[in-house]
Design a protein with these regions (language model features):
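Enriched for short, Lys/Arg-rich terminal
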Residues: 1-27, 32-39, 53, 60, ...
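Blade/loop signatures of beta-propeller domains
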Residues: 47-49
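Active-site rim helix/loop that mediates acceptor-substrate recognition in acyltransferases
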Residues: 63
Length: 98
């Protein structure tokens, strides 16, 4: 996968990778005070990206195949799940489906 940064913990079932935009958004969101919420969401995704809590939304349109979870009222963590590779690719986490 090009333009992707990896992050994995030893006992996690799923590997988290970031697009360039996803990593840029992560840094921006951390600086804006959402670090704890994002760490919590990433922990859920590492264990099972289809866990029903916190709730996720299956996206349509230009983002068909992607999912989102709420960071707060304005911002969403948007990701794609690659089942065979057990990878969760973070697309964005700033704004509402940017």
């Amino acid at each position: 996968m090009r333009n992707v940064l990896n992050h994995q913990m030893s006992n996690d079932k799923w590997r988290i990778v970031y697009t360039k935009q996803g990593l840029k958004d992560k840094n921006h969101a951390y600086k804006a005070g959402f670090k704890d919420k994002i760490i919590s969401l990433l922990s859920v995704l590492r264990k099972d990206p289809f866990t029903e809590y916190p709730p996720y939304e299956k996206l349509i349109g230009a983002l068909t195949g992607a999912y989102s979870r709420r960071i707060n009222q304005q911002h969403r963590l948007v990701y794609v799940v690659h089942l065979q590779e057990k990878i969760v690719k973070i697309i964005s986490m700033w704004e509402h489906y940017s």
